[in-house]
Amino acid sequence: MMKRERCLAADLRKILYLGATVGLTLALMFGRAVAEQSTEDLAAAAQNPVAAMYSLPFQNNIYGGVGPQHNSTANVLNIQPVIPITVGDWNIISRTIAPIIYLPSLSTGPSEIVEQSLFNKSHFGLGDINQTFYFSPAKASELIWGIGPSFNLPTATATPLGSAKFSMGPAAVALTMPKPWVIGTLVRQLWSVIGPSDRPNVSQLLLQPFVNYNMAEGWYLVSSPIITANWEASSNRWALPIGGGFGKIFRIGEQPMNASLQAFDYVKSPTDGPRWAVRAQLQFLFPR
């Protein structure tokens, strides 16, 4: 028990160091007056995955009904810094997802995992970090799009929290913004290219359609379910949630913020996967 507590404490320190590093980096980058923008402009930029705006979202996902008995709850906090760079007529949008994962104790893990004994206890730590670069035209048009490479880095601090594989593949996003709507979709396909031979290969599709309806005073309705397919699974490949929620653009002092809350029900789910999910997001906005 003491050894386990020391391991969890060590994992927590690593995560705190990561958060401190991200925070310090962003503080140095954004240590200047925030550009004034209207609430309408901020909402449009916050809802556009390839907008040329610095931002720091903290997205917390609660997954209920996981495990063989569908009575356990997992949690994933995604730290997702967005850094845009303009090069000539193009914007290069760097989007990072660093997941901090709590996985409850389960009698068995996913059927593709060989080391079933690892799921007899709970795990908390850093998962695999995803890094995506979108190349998007800097000139505005009715159809906004971006395309580029995506990489999954084997950074997990515990075996059940990651794939142990370096994976890569294409990513793309397309959207249109006929006021007051923002409608689009994001897609990514990853394949493992390097990693231990005793761990399952990775071939995973991620599809995220999103619809936003903007209203007065920064309020909006949103639906952005994350649909995934594990092509390596022999059955129950799809995770298909449906749902949505609401959000608001606001300011704390001079700092623009974006907060949202969504709830989802899973109409299809992998073996031992979730039955429902709640997603809460708080996003710091740094207009240029």
Walk through the language-model features, giving the residues of each.
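Bacterial N-terminal signal peptides
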Residues: Y17-M29
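Short, low-complexity disordered leader/linker segments with a strong preference
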Residues: C7-L8, L26, F30, V34-A35
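N-terminal secretory signal peptides that target proteins for export/translocation
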Residues: M1-I15
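Short alpha-helical segments used as structural interaction elements across diverse proteins
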Residues: A10-D11, M29, G245, W276
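Residues at the start of alpha-helices and the adjacent loop-to-helix junctions
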Residues: D11-R13, A27, N201
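Enrichment for repetitive, rod-forming helical segments
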Residues: A10, A20-T21, Y102, Q255
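Transmembrane beta-barrel domains of Gram-negative outer membranes and organellar outer membranes
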Residues: A35-R288
